[in-house]
Amino acid sequence: MNNSKTKKLVMASLLAALCCVATMIIKIPSPLKGYLNLGDCVVLLSGWLLSPAYGFAVAGVGSALADIFSGYVTYAPATFVIKGLMALIAYYGFKILGNKIGNLPSRIISGIVAEIVMVLGYFVFEGFLYGFIPSIVNIPANAVQGVAGIIIGTILIKVFEKSKIMME
């Protein structure tokens, strides 16, 4: 492995661990056995900082491990897919829009689209588990988590850019 591949693998591993920890540190139970957390900011960061494959893996693995370690094993497979898709959306949204409207607006827009996918993804997943009518109660909580993820992720990416850490 060359230095560049090693660096990418180390960055991805660190971000996956950070995603897991950020998801587990502050857990606010939601009405239907899930929980609110701060992991979405790392999910978005992984999409904005890494390649699509690494971003998907970081977001999916880090978030799913947090579910497993926290006793939400039933959620882990859905979390892997939903959070991985969020990172892909953040990546491609940023890449497509970045040159057209600038970095900050493209990150905000890609973050909003990614978080909408998260809210809808968990609504559908919980709809199959608990019924679609009861699953509606988690939509506002997931939306709040999404807004927090966008705000914190946008702040952190600016810090990373200024310090030149974790940039490919």
Model-derived regions: residue spans:
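Loop-helix junctions at membrane interfaces
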Residues: 1-168
